[in-house]
């Protein structure tokens, strides 16, 4: 273990990864990616937007995130060793990684407590998928400028004029009504091609992208420019 090896080399950096952590009632339990997704509430968060039951992320997301987090921890330990001359034992769990990954946005609603706090859906709920004539696209409007740009791009004058939706605060406060209304008005875009839809939103600086298929990625110009493939 670490203690024996550290006696041989005090500069040793040693990473231990577990499912649930070294202590506590779940310590030592076997864990796989879907198990951690469930225990960390990730599957509950994933199902929030549609208002349905828990839903797993269709990826081994926690295996990969834990590996990335471990690499970052080792890099930090290497930096610390340059200052102190000593190594350390890094204890990392998949569960801690999952909670830390979700908390900045998904955890906001349970961090602030009390009757005076206005609880809102996570910011990711502002994202929208839209079905078009030849595929799908995604867009997201957070700022009032982006919302105004969306309305100009798609001629959504009535939506923009509605006082329930004119500011980010009012759109968040009326999240369900906004989502329902937006889904309704977006029906008129179904005859648009993906390229036409994106061109309209790009012209107004509204963040948007086409929905890709895995088999398309190796020929994607942006990924080729990034030298991913």
Cite the ranges covered by each PLM segment:
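Short secondary-structure transition/capping segments
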Residues: 27-28, 171-175, 220-225
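Aromatic-enriched alpha-helical interface/lid elements that frame and gate functional surfaces
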Residues: 126-204, 208
């Amino acid at each position: 273990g670490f203690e024996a090896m550290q006696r041989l080399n005090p500069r040793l950096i040693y990473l231990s990864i577990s499912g649930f952590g070294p202590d506590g009632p779940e310590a030592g339990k076997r864990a796989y990616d879907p198990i951690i997704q469930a225990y960390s509430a990730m599957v509950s968060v994933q199902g929030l937007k549609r208002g349905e039951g828990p839903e797993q992320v269709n990826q081994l997301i926690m295996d990969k995130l834990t590996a990335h987090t471990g690499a970052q921890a080792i890099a930090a330990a290497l930096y610390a060793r340059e200052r102190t001359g000593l190594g350390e034992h890094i204890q990392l769990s998949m569960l801690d990684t999952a909670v830390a990954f979700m908390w900045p946005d998904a955890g906001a609603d349970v961090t602030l407590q009390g009757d005076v706090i206005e609880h809102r859906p996570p910011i990711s709920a502002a994202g929208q998928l839209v079905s078009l004539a030849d595929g799908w696209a995604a867009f997201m409007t957070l700022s009032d400028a982006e919302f105004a740009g969306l309305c100009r791009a798609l001629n959504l004058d009535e939506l923009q004029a509605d006082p329930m939706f004119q500011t980010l605060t009012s759109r968040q406060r009326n999240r369900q009504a906004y989502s329902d209304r937006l889904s309704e008005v977006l029906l008129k875009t179904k005859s648009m091609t993906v390229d036409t839809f994106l061109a309209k939103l790009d012209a107004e600086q509204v963040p948007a992208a086409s929905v890709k298929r895995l088999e398309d990625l190796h020929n994607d110009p942006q990924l080729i420019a990034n030298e991913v493939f």
